[in-house]
Every structure is written in C-alpha cells, then in structure tokens.
Amino acid sequence: SDEPSEEHKADYLKAKAVVEPYLPGCILRDALSSYDYYTEGLVKHPVVATNHITPFIENDVPDLWAYTCCGQCVDVGNRFLAMPSNRNRILGVQMWKYHITGFLHWGYNFWNSQLSKAVIDPFQVTDAGGAFPGGDGFSVYPGENGPLPSLRQKVFAMALYDMRALSLAEEKLGRESVLKLLGDGESLSLIHI
C-alpha cells in the first residue's frame, strides 16, 4: 500500500486479503501515516513518513521503520538535491535515537516522468518532469557498467554508518552516555531539522 487513509480502509483490507495468503512467513510492511491503522491491527509493521512518526515513537512501536519521499520537504531530513547534506546525514543519528530499525526511500532509479509516461535523463531532468522535488525519484544515475552512486546516496551511507557507530558506542558506554555526548539529543527530533 501507499499511505492508506480512513477512506481506503475497506479497499486496503480487501487487497491485503488477496495478497497475504501468498506470502506465508513474510513480514508485510506498509507505508502509512495513520496511527489508527496500527492500533486497530490492520498493519503490524508500519513504515511511517518521518513527518508523521511521532505517535509511533511515543508509543514504542517495535521494529519501526521510517521513510521519506516528496512530502517530507519541510522541517525534516531528506535527500533532495536542493537540501544540504546535513539534512540527509542526520537521519542515521535520528534513527538510532528513536530505535528506528529500517528506512525506506522509494526512488532508487526511477528515471521516468510521473506515472512512467516517458523515460527521462536524470542528468538533465531531476524532478520526474516536474512531478517531484529534484532527486526524489532516484539515488543513482545510469552508467555504462551499472548504476553510478550519487553524492546523496554516499551521504546516506554515512548516515547509516553513524547509526551503527552509535549502536556500538551504546553497547560499550550505555545509552545515556551516548545521548549526553550528543548534547542529550534534544535537538535531534525527527522534525524541525
């Protein structure tokens, strides 16, 4: 699914009932912002937009994943071309602080216009033909021998290294000590970067 809301509930449940029997033992994750979908048991493994994740964090949802896409453009981290790299790199620290175990970004190599009506050259057209913020649809560029990593992808890899380093520091020093090193982490909210 992609961000089901209250009005989509019946259709969501029908679609889930069709797919779920064919995926025994698989973890099904759904991109959503509605905390009600989780509390009502409709979604067991939410992947939440970072600008809507607060109630999930406040209620200690286990195995919580986060995501960004075109809607996360104000006051939160993301990986758009027009954003400074610190808005990308902070994501790893925030994921560690809030026990977020996974991250989804939909656009790895979407080198098309919106709805895939035309192929684009991402070196020339970065916004899917005006549909999304520049860079939202892709993290890599097409290369002769495979994908070419973008600076944004490399910075995000560093964010994940930061997350792992903080986890290791937590094992060695304890969580409170690491938070203290980060200035108690008060300014590391997932909103208001």
Tell me what each language-model feature is.
Residues 1-12, 16-33, 116-191:
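Catalytic domains of carbohydrate-active enzymes that cleave complex glycans
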Residues 1-116:
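Catalytic-core regions of glycoside hydrolase
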Residues 42, 191-193:
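Intervening/peripheral non-core polypeptide segments
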